[in-house]
């Protein structure tokens, strides 16, 4: 259903920028469609807030998170963007800035900018540190001023590089909000001095975070840390992210057994069905994959995307179910046991 009052409020807002108005009005138009097959019981869980689509909208027309293969882009350029493979640092940064403008996501901005140090390092020959820092400063400030959403991520490491060192120096200096950075840390590869430089930088500007490269490198053949620290396959990403909010679901429970054996399994099954329906529409009807130059040029592939599922409110749900007995999650053993209890019969 189209909500004209909400759209008009967006249209006449004096607090939103022009770009924010465009995105909000587009969301109003998207939500006017009813193209997904959603059964009544699933709609009930949406109405109560037990299932949350995290602002993905009623008619998915792009994946939630996209992680292009920026290395392939640098090697081959882009016919669609009429960009040849970059030959020097200026061309590299210009090419990346151009491509970022064309990488969609749920936020309408790129959520992943690549392993910037390994992309940049081969192009630093012939530039002094000061010259390179000036170019990187302009590059990072461009990202911060044009990607106006904090769910955006760049990666470093695990190996130390000159580009990585310079990026850390500039990050600490500019104190920008966007993008977030994560260092892929591997004790067998990452020198202590580089890890210490990353920690000092993080103390100065809250970037980069650190992730365990050994713990994550075998999950996918190549991965990136994207958006709000989501680890996903390069050349793919996440089709969708749907969350179950236990604090809302528990309001429908008649007791512990009803919640564990009936209500929670039903909600999870319907959540999975809903995610499948979103993916079906996105892949089969939206036209995104047949039309995107990111697909045509090999920067992403539909078989590299996966669904994401979230859950929140565990402690609150346990406390609600055991409130009559005064048991509290994190303090009482029986409450903690309920938090990790499995259904008694197979799913």
Model-derived features with residue positions:
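Conserved catalytic cores of very large enzyme subunits
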Residues: 2-303, 324, 330-338, 342-346
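Conserved phosphate/anionic-ligand binding catalytic regions in large, soluble enzymes, centered on
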Residues: 111, 301-317
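Well-ordered alpha-helical scaffold segments within catalytic/enzyme domains
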Residues: 316-324
């Amino acid at each position: 259903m189209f909500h004209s009052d909400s759209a008009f409020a967006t249209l006449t807002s004096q607090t939103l920028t022009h770009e924010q108005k465009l995105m909000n009005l587009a969301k109003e138009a998207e939500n006017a469609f009813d193209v997904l097959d959603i059964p009544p019981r699933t709609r009930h869980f949406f109405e109560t807030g037990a299932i949350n689509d995290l602002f993905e909208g009623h008619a998915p027309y792009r994946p939630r998170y996209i992680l292009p293969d920026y290395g392939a882009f640098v090697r081959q350029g882009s016919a669609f963007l009429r960009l040849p493979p970059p030959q020097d640092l200026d061309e590299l940064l210009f090419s990346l800035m151009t491509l970022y403008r064309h990488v969609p996501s749920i936020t309408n901005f790129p959520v992943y900018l690549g392993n910037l140090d390994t992309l940049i390092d081969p192009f630093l020959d012939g530039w002094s540190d000061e010259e390179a820092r000036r170019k990187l400063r302009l590059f990072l400030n461009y990202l911060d001023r044009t990607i106006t959403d904090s769910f955006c991520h760049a990666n470093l490491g695990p190996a130390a590089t000159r580009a990585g060192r310079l990026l850390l120096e500039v990050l600490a200096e500019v104190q920008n909000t966007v993008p977030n950075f994560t260092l892929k840390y591997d004790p067998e590869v990452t020198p202590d001095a580089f890890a210490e430089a990353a920690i000092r930088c993080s103390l100065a500007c809250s970037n980069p975070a650190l992730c365990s490269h050994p713990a994550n490198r075998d999950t996918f053949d190549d991965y990136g840390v994207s958006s709000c620290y989501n680890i996903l396959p390069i050349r793919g990403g996440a089709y969708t992210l749907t969350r179950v909010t236990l604090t809302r679901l528990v309001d429908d429970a008649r007791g512990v057994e009803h919640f564990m054996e009936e209500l929670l399994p039903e909600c999870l099954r319907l959540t999975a069905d809903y995610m499948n329906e979103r993916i079906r529409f996105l892949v089969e009807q939206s036209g995104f994959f047949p039309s995107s130059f990111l697909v045509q040029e090999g920067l992403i592939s539909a078989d590299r995307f996966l669904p994401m599922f979230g859950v929140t409110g565990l402690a609150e749900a346990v406390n609600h179910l055991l409130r009559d007995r005064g048991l509290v999650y994190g303090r009482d053993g029986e409450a903690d046991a309920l938090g990790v209890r499995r259904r008694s019969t197979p799913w």
